Amino acid sequence: CALPIYIFQKKLNTFNKIFRPKVTVENLLTMTSGVTFNESGIVSGNDWLTSYLNSSITGTPGENFQYNSLNTYVLSAIVTERTGQSLTEYLEPRLFAPLGITRYFWETCPKGITKGGWGLFLCTEDMAKLGQLYLQKGKWNDQQIIPEFWVEVSTAKHKESIEGTFGYGYQLWMEARPGSFEFNGMLGQNVIVYPDMNMVVVTNAGNNELFQNCVMLNIIRKHFPRNFHPADILPENPCSQTLLNRLTAELENGIHAPQTLPALRKGGWKKNPPGLRRSTNTRPNTWNYVKGLPAPNPYQFTQQLNGKVFELSPQSIGLFPLFIQIFHNNMTEGVQKISFTCEKGNFSVNFLESGEWHNIPTGFGKFKESWLTLHEESYLIAASGEFTTDENGTAVLKLDFTFLEECVRRKINIFFLPEDEILIRWYETPGKGMIMEGLESITEEISNNFLYGAFKGTGGLELLHRVMEQTIEPVSHGYLVTPAEVAPEQRSVSFLNESDCGELSAEPSETTTTSYSAESL
């Protein structure tokens, strides 16, 4: 592992061949290369390996821990250079097949090299298999898949870490409990191994956290502290099992309290003071609250929305969260129109983007699954809706779009205003907090730059922050433009189950895939 990376000498420019400090495989494994080309640089070019090899180095390789997923990418590139196979091809007969992992996908860079440090899609059960393999010292069904010595050396602490608090091994994080370690993927994807308790814990949370310092992992540490030593196997507990089954059923079926809304009339929403009734003849294009009429249920509301189309302004906000656009290099042009359809009890929210209508079947009190395709890339999503009102009595449709094979989600709140208008607030997870934190880290790195100082002195930094916040959580307006008979095309929607439009269990199952950062492979 201490051998310098000479196999890529041909990719170095003349200056770096002479003066660049040598980076070793050990440096890559322990995140101590010091190479400055990192995840943020991949959007600027297609040859990541050459950019990495010719970028500057801070300090001396091997001294300081600095997490950089491109270190793992270079490890993947080394496998390809030495074997002539991609990392995925190399692992298929040696790891995936013996463990029975058949449903996986690993993204590649523009040059065809497996990304290594991210972009691996695995089922939750298969994530657990990796932890169990390490728990068993690399052995699976009496076959030694990974050398035992490698399991031991890779799970030992080699460096004190910055983001984590317990140290770093070879592509693995140490955990709080002595002897425990963790496969840590960003946004709440983790495999935690407790050898002394013979236990593996897998999480698939989709939160805003990048590393080990997060609420979710602190909860796990709270229940499995250093001094916790479990007794023998617990006896069966039918009462607890019944409660668990009930909770699971509630999550799967999306049990919620009945929703009530103000009455909807043609033209828009109107909030009249109690006791007042306004004739619809005085303002024919306004939906009014009407005293004495019963509040409609969601079905009635969706029927009245059926066929309505709104043109949006601005039209630069994409249906895809920024996270997906950047990491998949699938940039969107922005939603131009939004419409609603309700046919045979099936409600859909439809978005016109890139000249194509995208229909999203939406459940109330439950999720519905469908495929969303943009630029020939398909994404499995689950959508649910909720009708409510804000503090001013304005009717609101809250939409929750979960990208099931990603760790992101898009949330959209649509406010129905008078005069046939809507206001839309767009949110995403990971959201403003994490993205703004990333912006802070970038500005810290360039804080000594003269131009940066001048920019900051003129208030430019505050302006940049405001622009970023408006980009992450934008607001758009919509105006009613077309009658009910103009319906969007249906070709872009695919129900997974035509009988129930693919009702979604709230708990990821073995048939649900997820994107997982798997540096340890």
Give the role of each language-model region:
Residues 185-285:
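Structured C-terminal helix/loop/strand segments within mature extracytoplasmic catalytic/sensor domains
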Residues 56-61, 71-73, 109-116, 176-177:
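Flexible glycine/proline-enriched surface loops and loop-helix/loop-strand junctions
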Residues 123-134, 139-161:
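A conserved catalytic-loop motif detector
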Residues 239-521:
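Peripheral terminal and inter-domain segments
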Residues 151-204:
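Active-site Gly/Thr loop motif
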Residues 1-33, 54, 85-118, 122:
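Active-site helix/loop module of the DD-peptidase/beta-lactamase fold
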Residues 37-40, 80-92, 138-147:
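Structural helix-adjacent loops and short alpha-helical linkers that scaffold large soluble proteins
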Residues 1-4, 28, 52, 65-96, ...:
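Alpha-helical scaffold elements that line and support the substrate/ligand-binding pocket
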